[in-house]
From Swiss-Prot:
Gene that produces this protein: ppdpf
A biological process term (GO) from this entry: cell differentiation
Record organism: Salmo salar (Atlantic salmon)
Function of the protein: Probable regulator of exocrine pancreas development.
Pfam families, A to Z: PPDFL
Protein name: Pancreatic progenitor cell differentiation and proliferation factor
Length: 121
């Protein structure tokens, strides 16, 4: 008995329920002029995604391939903004991690004694 891969089913389900609001792209995965302005209702059991682009999951692996789904503390901390009816993720975590690593490297560099200068007394 043949089975349907779950990934294909999720992609097909997502494509069916995706909102298509005035896309001007010629790429068939981004909507078409035939469906311009059509709003397909979102089923309550599925999480919303931000853009519906197949490649977005490569940039948001920590969100379980659901970059538009607001999860836990991210929902409270305001890391998402709404523009043109689509949810876009702000990479706040990446910025905070970069700032933290920069602070740690600066503090470790300031603790080193340079050659030629006397140690502090």
């Amino acid at each position: 008995m043949a089975s349907i891969p779950s990934t294909g089913s999720l992609i097909a389900t997502h494509d069916y329920y995706r909102r298509r609001i005035g896309s001007t792209s010629s790429n068939s995965s981004c909507g078409s002029s035939e469906y311009a302005g059509e709003v397909i209702p979102h089923p309550p059991g599925l999480q919303r995604q931000d853009s519906g682009h197949w490649w977005s999951s490569f940039f948001f692996p920590n969100k379980q391939n659901q970059p538009g789904g607001m999860i836990g503390s991210e929902q409270k901390s305001g890391t998402y903004t709404v523009t043109n009816g689509q949810v876009a993720c702000i990479a706040r975590e990446m910025v905070l991690k970069k700032q933290l690593s920069r602070q740690l490297s600066e503090s470790s560099d300031s603790g080193k004694v340079e050659q030629g200068s006397p140690p502090p007394s």
